[in-house]
Each structure stands twice: as C-alpha cells, then as structure tokens.
Amino acid sequence: MATFVDRVTVHLRAGNGGNGCVSVRREKFKPLAGPDGGNGGNGGDIVLVADPQVTTLLGYHRRPHRSSGNGGFGMGDHRSGHTGEDLELPVPVGTVVKSSEGAELADLTEPGMRIVAAPGGIGGLGNAALSNPKRKAPGFALLGTPGWEGDILLELKTVADIALVGYPSAGKSSLIAALSAAKPKIADYPFTTLHPNLGVVQVGDVRYTVADVPGLIEGASEGRGLGFEFLRHVERCSALLHVLDCATLEPGRDPLSDLDVILAELAAYPVPEGQLPLLERPQLIALNKIDVPDARELADFLRPDLEARGYRVFEISTVSHEGLRPLSFALAELVERARKEQAVLDETRPRIIVRPKTVDDSGFVVKVEGGSEGPVYRVLGAKPERWVAQTDFQNDEAIGYLAARLAKLGVEDQLVRVGAVAGSTVVIGRENGVVFDWEPTLTSAAELISSPRGTDARIGVNARPTRAQRREDYFDRMDAKAEARAELLREREAGLWKDDDAAVQGGSEETGRE
C-alpha cells in the first residue's frame, strides 16, 4: 500500500449560504409592528493550511471529497441563521495548489500559510434588512448563494536546499542517512527509494535540508524506470549533488557515462517559468564507495577529468564516513551563498500593487454572442450574477427588486449601447445563466426559468383581491340574484310565462278531486 502521495485531485464543496426569512412581527395591540425576518448565515469556507507536521497527501488520496458546513436559514424575530463551520485542510509545506485547468493558484512554501481554496456562499438578507421608507414591509427575502464547488490539484514539491541525484543504488539514501538523522530504506537493489526522503544537516551554525530523490536512468524523461516526474521535488533546491557509484559492476557503466546520462535527463526536465534551469544551478560531485577495493583508484583516475569540466569533486564513503565532513561544509557554503542571493532578490523583487477600481467601473460587462436565432447579449459581472442567484423567481416582488437593482447598476443603458432592441435575448451569468427577453420599456424583464420563453411574471397583475373587494363582490352578486328573482316574478304575474311545475301540480290536484 502506498505511504507517500505527492499529487492528488481533490473535490471541494463549500457550504451554501442560508436563505433570508420573510416574517412580519405579530404582537398584541401592534398590528403594524413591521418586518422581522432575519438574515441567512454565510456558508463555511474550505481553507488549505501549510502544516510542517504533514509530509504526504495520502489522506486526500483516500478521501478526495471534502465539504464544509452550510449556513443556517434566517428566522423571525430578527434571528439570523448560524454561520457554516469552516473546514481547514492541513497540507505539507511546499504544496502547490492548481486549478482543474492547471493554473497555479498558490504556493504554500512557509509553515502556517493559508489559502481559501473554496469560499462559502453568502447568506441572503431577510425582509427586515430589505425594508426602507418606500418598502416598509417587503414580502420577499434574498436567497443564499451556493458555495464554490469543483476540483483542485494539489502537487507537493519538497522544500530542500540540496538535492541528491544519481543512478539507482549509487548510495544516495546511505549518504543522507550518514549526514543526518534520517532513516530511509536502504537495500542492495535498484529503486529502493520510491519517494523523496528529507534529512536536516547541522554544520556549525548553518542548518540545511537535503533531499534524496529516486534514482534516474537513461530514458527517464520518456517514462523508463520511475520516470522523472519526481524531479519536481528538485525544483526548489538551490544546489545539486551528483552521487556517482565508483564500485558498479554493471557492464557498460562507469561514473562518467552515468554523469552524462543524469545531465541529459536533468536538461530534459521542464522547470516552471521564472525558475533557474536545473543545470544552471551550483553542482558538486561525490565519488562514492571508495571503501570498496579498486573504487578508490577509479575515483583518483576520474577526479582530474571531472575537475577539468569545472566540477568540485569529493571522494567519500558512507560506510567509513570518509570525506563526509569536507563535503558537508562545502554544501553549507553553497546554501549560505544561495540564501544571501535570495535575500537580495527578495529586496529588489517588484512589489504587488493593488489599485482601487476606477470611478467609472460599472462592475459588469455585456458581451455580444452569435446565436441561431440572432445575437445573444450576455451580462457578466460579480454583482449581477450574485443578484440573480439570490433572487426568488417565484416571488413577483423579488423579481421587481432585481429589476430595480439592475437598472440602477446601468445594465439596461449598456444593453442599449451595444445594440439590443425589444425582444433581444439577454443572459445574465455564464453556463447556467438566467435567460429573458428584454423589453426596454420596463426596468428589466427577468424571465422565470419555469415559465415559457418570452413571458414575464412581473407583467401579470396580482389577482388576489383584498378583503374589502371580496366583501363588495359578494354583495354585488347577492343584489344581482335578488334583482333577477324579482324580474322573474313580475314577468310571471304579467302572464308572459307560467310555471310548468306549478301547472302539473294543479292538474294532479283537480284529478284527485274528481
């Protein structure tokens, strides 16, 4: 069973915002106490936190679906709904957060760094919050918006100062075990190391981290062996240490050819934009296993050739610890130099300037798209899309409120500017946007999703009569019935017609008397 996972796709569902409440205060001797509907609670966020105690993404590989709490609905008596509980997900330091399309969202390189990966929905306002001098008792409330839902990609890139690279069984794991207190798996067969191992080395006042990555072979960039995808763990390293095996018995292999193969594979690895290519970083060479017979002679023979290439060479043995002390001090020197250079870069790095929105920023755009039945005008913007999501399209007053907000924002004026005419198809939102047929004589014309295309529930008159109207209608019907009965009585008395039932009944009585 896998114990180390460095790349995983996680499906997140943030909490939905609670709906606002429609309520009117009912109290004795106060018939006009006013609205008292509370607001809905906000949905919980899903937050990623860089935790130094976490070293793998295995937990998210086993449970890829995570969700936070929903916000509570508003209630009467000005009681707001509860806020949904946030969900904090600990991830290893060095985790890169990417969208499902591959765009980098955040790089959690320091312990304690946080990012809201999935924001929760916004709670809807109750009718108490929507009341004003002109709308004293709103008969509607705003709905809560849904929380963000989708997939993100978590990719772990080990944060280390020095990376050990080399062929399988070159002694990289033994070296990191000799330099630090790390205890990686060590065996005498290739590909013993299947995932990166980290070790902390203390040299004088300098402390640095060494990463042991799985071995590289020729063709790793084409997928041979374990491939070279794990080289993402080398991207953050400031220097490389090539560990060459001077005691290999495999035919066709020698330390120089091994080095050429490793350099070719490192050159084929694409580093992210803005980072220094792997081969342009400081590199040292460690000729390992000089304790083996004939290995020391081979190391002495190869050393001049490697130094002629510009490398600084160390002859070491992880068994006898020979040469490890000067190697550790040389690595510390590289780390100190890289840290000073990084400090200078951080000081000269351009600062991110957040500028406020311009005065004439409307907060939305109108795009004209082609359609089979003519142009489609799509309104995109945070405010219009959120307002549509918060509107209860089963409530006429809520639709009117949406129309007023869109008109005040300037949506109708912008539609006129881009060429929309009466009957044009307008969509607010993206894929699941609300479609309506635009009528410029109205403030807006939001179409009910459940109603036929081109109709608008706001245009219809509210057919529910008042109590006085029902009372007046009842008396009118009673008066009409009384007048009709009186008219029939007058016509019968005038002989214009006679009651057949009465005539039949009279004839039966005469027959009985005979």
Curated annotation (Swiss-Prot):
A UniProt-annotated Pfam family: GTP1_OBG
UniProt protein name: GTPase Obg
GO process annotations (BP): ribosome biogenesis
Family, similarity comment: Belongs to the TRAFAC class OBG-HflX-like GTPase superfamily. OBG GTPase family.
Keyword Amino-acid biosynthesis part of the UniProt annotation: no
Subunit structure: Monomer.
Primary residence: cytoplasm
Residues engaged in binding Mg(2+): S173, T193
Localization (cell): Cytoplasm
Segments of this protein annotated with the region Disordered: 62-88
Top-level enzyme category: hydrolase
The keyword Hydrolase belongs to this UniProt entry's keyword annotation: yes
